[in-house]
């Protein structure tokens, strides 16, 4: 039976018409047959046959129409950030708050696979229903972001570091959106590497335009550039995946062997890196921060 595309991916009032085993049978506005797993009922004591309730309607992988009372933040009419669960040859699988995951097809992702999102990243998406009534994730277009971002029309954010996620990647630069809703553009000349789609990055604000869009940079200010000892430590941290088993109480001989510097020089260097929020100093180790990783070149 073909599904009614009009109700798939949206919140609808459906009538409960019966119970078959552990599955409630529902009827849509155009007499569509919709199933509801009994475990999906929020309050069964207040759930009666013959009554209408609000549900989110979605297809399972076999094409059967199901409903849930757990309303997702993302529908076919609403955009939001969704967490990436995994990546495979078909594309990126995301969690939109439904009993099943949703696929963003590989055709909609960057051509360079190293720029694809990784598990734990977040994508700004809505739901798309295709001609076979299957449900996919659709990335937000520039037009959509322009309709929802929060403009900044003064210099209040100048030189501030802001956490934001990449929602669009072009050769000319990276387009980011922050949790506060700020839209940020980083020109290719202001970055050493390109962030992944959906990756959270730290960006320094360097200006704004007449539309209230912010301009950003991944490059450090001149006074934030590292001295020779700091650069040695930073480069080794990058080489060893952001973590080294050294701290201010490590032995002078071990420091000399690995970093070729005195313990005093090492302590001064990691102190400067810590003050610049490039590293964290923990018991027995130093690690790169998000700000530190933002300095990394390809």
Curated annotation (Swiss-Prot):
Q: Which organism is it from?
A: Staphylococcus epidermidis (strain ATCC 35984 / DSM 28319 / BCRC 17069 / CCUG 31568 / BM 3577 / RP62A)
Protein family: Belongs to the CvfB family.
Q: One Pfam family this chain carries?
A: CvfB_2nd
Name used for this protein in its record? Conserved virulence factor B
The protein's matches in InterPro entries, at most eight in alphabetical order, are given as: CvfB_fam, CvfB_S1_2nd, CvfB_S1_3rd, CvfB_S1_st, CvfB_WH, NA-bd_OB-fold, WH-like_DNA-bd_sf
PANTHER family to which the protein is assigned, alphabetical? CONSERVED VIRULENCE FACTOR B
The portions of this protein that span the membrane are none
Coiled-coil positions: none
């Amino acid at each position: 039976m073909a599904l009614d595309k009009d109700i798939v991916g949206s919140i609808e009032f459906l009538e409960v018409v019966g119970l078959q085993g552990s599955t409630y049978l529902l009827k849509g506005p155009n007499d569509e047959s919709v199933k509801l797993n009994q475990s999906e009922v929020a309050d069964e004591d207040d759930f009666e046959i013959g009554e209408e309730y609000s549900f989110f309607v979605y297809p399972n992988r076999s094409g059967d129409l199901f409903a849930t009372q757990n309303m997702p933040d993302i529908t076919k009419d609403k955009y939001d950030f969704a967490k990436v669960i995994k990546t495979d040859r078909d594309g990126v699988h995301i969690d939109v708050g439904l009993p099943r995951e949703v696929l963003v097809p590989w055709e909609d992702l960057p051509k360079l696979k190293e720029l694809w999102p990784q598990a734990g990243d977040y994508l700004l998406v809505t739901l798309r229903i295709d001609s076979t009534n299957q449900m996919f994730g659709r990335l937000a277009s520039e037009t959509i972001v322009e309709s929802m971002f929060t403009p900044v029309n003064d210099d209040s954010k100048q030189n501030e570091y802001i956490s934001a996620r990449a929602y669009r990647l072009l050769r000319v630069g990276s387009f980011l959106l922050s949790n506060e809703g700020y839209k940020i553009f980083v020109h290719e000349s202001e970055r050493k590497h390109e962030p992944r789609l959906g990756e959270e990055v730290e960006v320094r604000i360097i200006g704004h335009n007449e539309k209230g869009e912010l301009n950003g940079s991944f490059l450090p200010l001149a006074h934030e550039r590292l001295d020779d000892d700091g650069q040695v430590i930073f480069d080794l941290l990058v080489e060893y995946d952001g973590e080294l088993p050294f701290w201010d109480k490590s032995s002078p001989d071990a420091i000399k062997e690995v970093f070729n510097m005195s313990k005093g020089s090492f302590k001064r260097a990691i102190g400067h890196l810590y003050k610049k929020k490039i590293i964290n100093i923990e018991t027995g180790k130093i690690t790169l921060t998000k700000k530190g990783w933002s300095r990394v070149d390809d």
